[in-house]
UniProtKB/Swiss-Prot annotation:
Protein's recorded name: Uncharacterized protein Synpcc7942_1683
Family: To Synechocystis PCC 6803 ssr2439.
Keywords: Sulfate transport, Transport
Stated role: May have a regulatory function.
Amino acid sequence: MATLRIRLQVPKKYRDQPLMGDVLASCQLQFNILAAHLGPNREEDGWFDVMLTGTSEDITAALAVLRDRDIELWSDTEDEF
């Protein structure tokens, strides 16, 4: 199993959708939200700090889906995912 800690910005257009759960569960990943800044009445985008656990292939697939939805991603790791 591989792990990857990422930070991501979720555009406010996804505020009322279960984006994180849907994408990460569909890629068979476990995820732990380490920190978040998001609320139903906020006008800004939301931010999450998450730890992903799964196969390298599943992590790569989830990151591709998130990028396709215009989610900005940051990671402190040198690993290529």
